[in-house]
């Protein structure tokens, strides 16, 4: 069975963002663009409390997963040396502004 975000409402979730950041939070709302309203947000690796409430754009999200309430060790200590850093999934183009300048010039001629 495939889960939908509505199955995760008002539950603890793990969120992996496209920049590789991993968050633990409670999912309180979402929309058709996968924008998420989350509360009690923690960084998964450093255990640092980030904020009480946050709105994440759907374009920033790579994965949302449910945390098992019975075995919730999401904020248990982690040996950071053993955790591989997640690769950034953003599409980055070097000197992208130069490309867009050429596109603009070609359309204005």
UniProtKB/Swiss-Prot annotation:
One GO MF term attached to the UniProt entry: mRNA binding
One GO CC term on file: spliceosomal complex
Highest taxon of the lineage: Eukaryota
Complex formation: Component of the heptameric LSM2-LSM8 complex that forms a seven-membered ring structure with a donut shape; an RNA strand can pass through the hole in the center of the ring structure. The LSm subunits are arranged in the order LSM8, LSM2, LSM3, LSM6, LSM5, LSM7 and LSM4. Component of the spliceosome U4/U6-U5 tri-snRNP complex composed of the U4, U6 and U5 snRNAs and at least PRP3, PRP4, PRP6, PRP8, PRP18, PRP31, PRP38, SNU13, SNU23, SNU66, SNU114, SPP381, SMB1, SMD1, SMD2, SMD3, SMX2, SMX3, LSM2, LSM3, LSM4, LSM5, LSM6, LSM7, LSM8, BRR2 and DIB1.
Keywords from the UniProt entry: Cytoplasm, mRNA processing, mRNA splicing, Nucleus, Ribonucleoprotein, RNA-binding, rRNA processing, Spliceosome, tRNA processing
The keyword rRNA processing is annotated on this UniProt entry: yes
GO terms of biological process kind: mRNA splicing, via spliceosome; rRNA processing; tRNA processing
Additional detail: Present with 1440 molecules/cell in log phase SD medium.
Main location, first listed in the record: nucleus
Localization, UniProt: Nucleus; Cytoplasm
Similarity comment: family membership: Belongs to the snRNP Sm proteins family.
PROSITE patterns xref list: SM
SUPFAM superfamilies: Sm-like ribonucleoproteins (SSF50182)
Gene3D superfamilies found in the cross-reference section: 2.30.30.100
SMART domains: Sm
Protein known as: LSM2-LSM8 complex subunit LSM8
A matching Pfam family: LSM
CDD domains, per database record: LSm8
Residue ranges annotated for the Sm domain, each copy included: 1-70
Function text: Component of the nuclear LSM2-LSM8 complex, which is involved in spliceosome assembly. The LSM2-LSM8 complex plays a role in the biogenesis of the spliceosomal U4/U6-U5 tri-snRNP complex by accelerating PRP24-mediated annealing of U4/U6 di-snRNA. The LSM2-LSM8 complex binds U6 snRNA terminating with a non-cyclic 3' phosphate group. LSM2-LSM8 is probably also involved in degradation of nuclear pre-mRNA by targeting them for decapping. LSM2-LSM8 could be involved in processing of pre-tRNAs, pre-rRNAs and U3 snoRNA, although involvement may be indirect.
Protein's organism: Saccharomyces cerevisiae (strain ATCC 204508 / S288c) (Baker's yeast)
